[in-house]
Amino acid sequence: MTIDDELRDRIKRSAKKHALLNAVKHKSDAEVGAIMGPLMGENPEFRPHGDAIPGIVSGVVSQINDLSVDERRSRLETIAPEALTDIESEDTTDTYDLPSLPGVSDDEPTQSVRMRAAPNPNGPWHIGHARMPAVIGTYSNRYDGSFIIRFDDTDPETKRPDLDAYDDILEDVAYLGFEPDDVIRASDRLELYYARARELIDAGGAYTCSCSGEHFSKLKNAGEACPHREKSVNQTQTEFEAMIHGEYSAGEMVLRVRTDIEHKNPALRDWVAFRLIDTPHPRPQAADYRCWPMLDFQSGIDDHETGVTHIIRGIDLQDSAKRQRFVYDYFDWEYPEVVHWGHINVDEYDVSLSTSTLIEKIETGELDGWDDPRAPTLQSLRRRGIKGDAIVEAMINLGTSTTNVELSMSSIYSNNRQHIDAKADRYFFVRNGETFTLETASEDTIAGHPPLHPDNPERGERVVPVTDGITIEPADVPADGDRVWLKGYACVRRDDNHFRTTNDGIEVVREGDVDVIHWAPAPESSASISVRMRTPDGDITGIAEPDLTDAEIDDIVQFERVGFARIDTKDEQSLDTDMTVYWTHP
């Protein structure tokens, strides 16, 4: 259906208003996709011309985006003053998805906020790990505070650090869009922990104990003191120094914090602060140490020494704060504010969110590595083309409730789509296709010419040849004698193993008589591109159109009616494919 000059002018005028509204309201460039809905909703008479309107709107949007911020506001005030008034009268008070931190005012913060993420560096992060840096980094930005990464690597045996994980985790933090103000490795700070332990002993707050774990557990559960509890400060200091100098074997001696042996919670009764581990630490700087602090002691000391003001930890770790408060009371320190939250569960994956499980599956070959698309890791999401911002936004939306929360991967996909859709060029990719010959009406119809991007016609068109036949997905194959619309080409009718073009116009699609499908050159065609797509459900092979070779490695494209994908490698002759891509999401 032809658009006459009068209708074209009306479309441009309405598009100008909505483009200005979009740009002024969001304080950014207008986007064609963002204004098409309001434009068509306000002008239903435009709908019969839906295919042509984006091209007209695109030119208007480009003109608006060339204007300065002040010019956009001035023009909107001229053509739609009421709309400008509505925008400027909207509540401009900052709203946050996260609740305010305890003791901190959003209007006038009275203290400097300093928070930490304290990972165990035993491997790269899975998706659940992203929640802590996402929330802490967001709070840090909100309050102009500080964000610390502290590697709690003081267990060289049970939770043995992976030397590569330190850098892997920092890369994961950067991927999420944050840069820590400080990076601390607890294994560098043993002498500090020893010094604080000596002070605690002097204050009567700790004693050395050689009871077996089983024997002490029986005494503790009965609320009875172990005989070592009455040791003198001098004896305790002497035996603690012997622990430091390796004069005892693992399991022979520990240092306990003196709490309340009759406390109603047995887990808080005279807990272990230091123990002996014979296994050397993998970091050369810490390999000679054998006397290691337990996490509750090390973490409590570090939180004070580094000025942490607010701690976020799992609801299951409430006892940690209670244990540490005994040490803080001995030193007359003020304990940081604590926010407890529930566990996070992530849908869509068959592999559990467990670093040890992932390590096992990688070692046995079930997974190719940390960035295998089947792995629920940040490295995997990054390789698939998911932006860190999309993950952060999803994590922030979970809040900080004490109840367990379910993270739907669809929320990450939805966020990511907002980041990549406007930039992703479109291509055809056919999986497990069926091949047909195609009889063209003339030499002018030897190729399809779909746009690289429907909202950005200025990017140009692709060229998809049909002369050597086409391939389409099995679900799209019409019954013999039925028609389909080959997107970007024409309406065709099936005749056994052949297709013939018809004289039908686009109105058969608008009226719902004919389905629109994607397609690609036949596999035997010199124009076809063989593609391996790696997905969370396994690898898929298929055929893509020739212009896909124009995409660069790391580009994110959209395979129409299939989903987004990131270009990973090209010219992979060893795999008998022309290209490997990683599926991003629908």
Swiss-Prot record:
A motif ('HIGH' region) lies at residues 119-129. It comes from the Archaea. GO terms for molecular function: ATP binding; glutamate-tRNA ligase activity. Its main location: cytoplasm. The keyword Cytoplasm applies. It is an enzyme of class 6 (ligase). Residues 84-111 are annotated as: Disordered. Residues 85-94 have a biased composition (Acidic residues). Coiled coil: none annotated. It is found in: Cytoplasm. It catalyses: tRNA(Glu) + L-glutamate + ATP = L-glutamyl-tRNA(Glu) + AMP + diphosphate. GO terms for cellular component: cytosol. Keywords: Aminoacyl-tRNA synthetase, ATP-binding, Cytoplasm, Ligase, Nucleotide-binding, Protein biosynthesis. InterPro entries: Gln/Glu-tRNA_Ligase (IPR050132), Glu-tRNA-synth_arc/euk (IPR004526), Glu/Gln-tRNA-synth (IPR000924), Glu/Gln-tRNA-synth_Ib_cat-dom (IPR020058), Glu/Gln-tRNA-synth_Ib_codon-bd (IPR020059), Rbsml_bL25/Gln-tRNA_synth_N (IPR020056), Ribosomal_bL25/Gln-tRNA_synth (IPR011035), Rossmann-like_a/b/a_fold (IPR014729). NCBIfam families: gltX_arch, PRK04156.1. Belongs to the class-I aminoacyl-tRNA synthetase family. Glutamate--tRNA ligase type 2 subfamily. This is Glutamate--tRNA ligase. It comes from Haloquadratum walsbyi (strain DSM 16790 / HBSQ001). The gene is gltX.
